[in-house]
Regions:
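Outer-membrane beta-barrel translocator domains and adjoining extracellular loop/strand segments
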Residues: 38-40, 60-68, 104-116, 148-150, ...
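Transmembrane beta-strands of outer-membrane beta-barrel pores
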Residues: 29-31, 53-57, 91-93, 100-104, ...
Length: 319
């Protein structure tokens, strides 16, 4: 997709299609009151459901050595409760994947100088993540088609109310939504090939932070790529157009950029000479711009250029 072309580097993960029908369940426990339950049910070629629950009390001991004291303490408010469930269904070229995650965790207070200076353990964090995605992939001779539709919903609640330092008081809730759609097509004509893709993403951010104004973003990307392969020579050229616009109180300037990529390699015998050039444009995310403490509305887009030349030698004489 165009979003994949836009990344400086990409790791491709594809959900495994079950090759057998099975049902498994497990229970584990460990130190510091840790308990874990997990279960997986899969049906050959059709889909699976996987769930896990984890609970730990934390409260683990630790050694503390400074010029003021040498002692052992116990880390309080370090509990974690987590639940995750996800499922995936397959039918011909269609794949539907749904995921849900919920967690509550404590955030231990920091130590200033002495163990007795430990901040009161009041920090807490609540997370909830959900997404549902439908993917279509099919080939018709030399023509390949791919489509993706995805909806994501994320919630974060962070609270820290240290009586020792009221200046770091925080009790914020963030809610983000993301709707994403992508379509891509590829055509192979002998030694030549063409591919085109376009992505459209709508995302928003709401929070109860004082003086925060609702913001949503429209992000579109379009890419066109051509490649040639013959007698050990491989060449790929591509262009990507990105347009990002934020809509909130006041005015924001849209961001647009055209970037280019080129890759070439030549193989003769055990030797391969390869090189590539890639320019990358990345707009700050809504988190980068609008989150409390870590957000900075004055952030500028990132521009990256990558260039690489390498030689590879392969031989069957070495294991």
């Amino acid at each position: 997709t165009a979003t994949e072309y836009a990344s400086a580097s990409t790791v491709y993960l594809r959900t495994h299609r079950p090759d057998s029908t099975s049902l498994t369940a497990s229970y584990q426990n460990g130190s510091f009151g840790t308990h874990k339950l997990a279960a997986t049910c899969s049906y050959k070629d059709w889909g699976f459901v996987d769930a896990a629950y984890t609970r730990t009390k934390g409260n683990y001991p630790f050694s503390y050595h400074t010029q003021y004291e040498d002692t052992t303490g116990t880390r309080r408010n370090s509990d974690i409760t987590m639940f995750r469930i996800e499922g995936c269904a397959f039918w011909k070229g269609l794949q539907w994947h749904t995921y849900y995650f919920n967690s509550v965790r404590g955030l231990p207070g920091g130590i200033v100088r002495r163990l007795s200076d430990t901040y009161t353990d009041v920090g807490r964090e609540w997370d909830r993540n959900f997404f549902s995605q439908l993917t279509y992939r099919e080939e018709f001779g030399r023509l390949g088609l791919r489509g993706i539709v995805k909806y994501a919903n994320d919630y974060l609640h962070y609270r820290s109310d240290y009586p020792e330092n009221i200046s770091v008081h925080s009790n914020n809730r963030y809610h983000q939504q993301d709707v994403y759609g992508a379509a891509a097509a590829s055509l192979r004509l002998g030694r030549f090939g063409l591919s085109a893709s376009t992505d459209l993403r709508w995302s928003d951010l709401t929070t109860d932070v004082k003086n925060f104004h609702y913001v949503y973003r429209m992000d579109s990307k379009t890419s066109l790529s051509a490649f040639y392969s013959h007698n050990g020579l491989n060449v790929n050229l591509s262009g990507l157009y990105t347009h990002v616009s934020d809509h909130t109180y006041g005015t924001t300037k849209p961001m647009s950029k055209m970037t280019w990529n080129a890759l070439a390699s030549y193989t003769t015998g055990p030797w391969t000479l390869r090189t590539f050039y890639k320019s990358v444009f990345r707009a700050p995310t809504l988190n980068d711009l609008y989150y409390t403490l870590v957000g900075n509305r004055n952030l500028k887009p990132e521009y990256t250029k990558q260039f690489d030349v390498g030689v590879v030698y392969k031989t069957d004489g070495l294991d």
